[in-house]
Every structure is written in structure tokens, then in C-alpha cells.
Design a protein with these regions (language model features):
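Membrane-interfacial loop-to-helix junctions in multi-pass transporters
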Residues: 2, 78-79, 114
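Short helix-perturbing small/polar motifs within transmembrane alpha-helices
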Residues: 28-98, 119-135, 146-152
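C-terminal transmembrane helix-loop-helix hairpin of multi-pass membrane proteins
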Residues: 100-198
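Membrane-interfacial loop-to-transmembrane alpha-helix junctions, especially the N-terminal start
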Residues: 3-8, 48, 138-143
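Core alpha-helical transmembrane segments of integral membrane proteins
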Residues: 1-23, 32-37
Length: 198
């Protein structure tokens, strides 16, 4: 089943990190714990949870990582969207060098990284909350709010990193806006690919 296949993949990822001194074994332990907790709490809910959690890897590979939290927020109820967002973050921190999103986070010990993580999770949950009623207007509003949070989070992170006021990078801004537009179109079309029942 997809959830157990996802668990196996994430466990292998965690073990490989634990056995590798770089970046750090503790990250492997975190990855293993997060994978087990996610499957126990959320992953068994259905295929949608698995897809929303793991979609970050292919999207990051093609440069559209900002679409991942919006997809999770659109398709899942808040509690399950939170679980998917956490797994997305863990995957970005652990396999980012293979999928691209490491440029969004950088070092796990830096403040900008944690600002981005918080923004990512808040954007996902807020979009999910707004999309619960499954109306076109709230779906569009959810996508816009999620995009703004992602843009602001990176802007704040870059400001702290550089020491002077800065906005999000051009690439991040473009991909986030495109992701927002895509989700607005999905919202207008009223796609039924949702699993909002808790």
C-alpha cells in the first residue's frame, strides 16, 4: 500500500542519514521518528495523504516547491495537512540536495531556515482551514494567503541573513506566484480532489 511504501522509503532515507556523518546523524533519527509518527497518525488515512506528503520531491526537482504546501492545504483537512507539511519539511531538509529545495532552507541551525519552516507549515494549515468549506472564493483566498505567507517568510529570512531589508528571491517569487495562480484555477474549476472529512 502507498503509506507503507512511503514509510519504507522514508525509513531508508533516515537510516542512510544516521549512518552518514554529514550532515548529522541526529537528522537521520528525526527523519525516522517523523516517518513513523506520520504513518501512525496520518499516513494510514489514504492515498491522498501520501501523495500530498511526498509531492515535494518531484515538485522541488522541477523548481515548483511552493506548490507542495498549497496542494496539501487544498486536498486535506487541517490536521492531516499539518502532518503532510511536516513530512514535506523533513524531506526538504534531508533530501533537498537531490530535489532542489535545499536552497529554500539552507542550514538547519540558521534562524532563516526555521522562519521558512514556520511559514511553510502556517501556509499549509491556513489554506486547509480556508478550503474546508470547499467554496471557490475561499479556495482562491486560501491560495493567495498561502502564497503571501511563503513570500513574506523568505523575505524575513533573507532580511535576517543579510542584515538589511530584503524581499524574496526572484525565482522564489515567480514560482510562488505561478503556484498561486495554478491553485486559483483549480479553485475556480471546483476540483473534487479533496478529502476534507476528518
Amino acid at each position: 500500500k502507498p503509506p507503507f511504501g512511503a514509510l519504507l522509503a522514508m525509513l531508508i532515507n533516515g537510516v542512510s542519514l544516521f549512518l552518514c556523518p554529514v550532515p548529522m546523524p541526529v537528522l537521520g533519527v528525526v527523519a525516522i521518528a517523523a516517518a513513523i509518527a506520520w504513518v501512525v497518525l496520518f499516513g494510514r488515512e489514504g492515498v491522498a495523504d501520501t501523495n500530498c506528503a511526498l509531492v515535494i520531491s518531484p515538485l522541488g526537482l522541477v523548481g515548483f516547491a511552493p506548490l507542495a504546501p498549497m496542494i496539501a492545504g487544498y486536498c486535506l483537512p487541517p490536521r492531516r495537512a499539518l502532518g503532510a507539511a511536516i513530512i514535506q519539511v523533513v524531506l526538504m531538509l534531508t533530501v533537498g540536495k537531490n530535489t532542489g529545495p535545499e536552497l529554500l532552507f539552507g542550514s538547519i541551525t540558521s534562524i532563516p531556515t526555521w522562519i521558512m519552516i514556520c511559514g511553510w507549515i502556517i501556509a499549509t494549515v491556513l489554506m486547509s482551514v480556508l478550503c474546508v468549506r470547499e467554496t471557490r472564493i475561499l479556495s482562491i483566498l486560501g491560495a493567495i494567503c498561502a502564497a503571501l505567507i511563503l513570500l513574506i517568510a523568505q523575505g524575513i529570512g533573507l532580511t535576517i541573513l543579510t542584515g538589511f531589508p530584503a524581499g524574496p528571491s526572484g525565482t522564489w517569487a515567480i514560482t510562488t506566484v505561478l503556484a498561486c495562480v495554478a491553485m486559483c484555477v483549480v479553485g475556480v474549476l471546483g476540483s473534487s480532489v479533496r478529502h476534507k472529512g476528518e
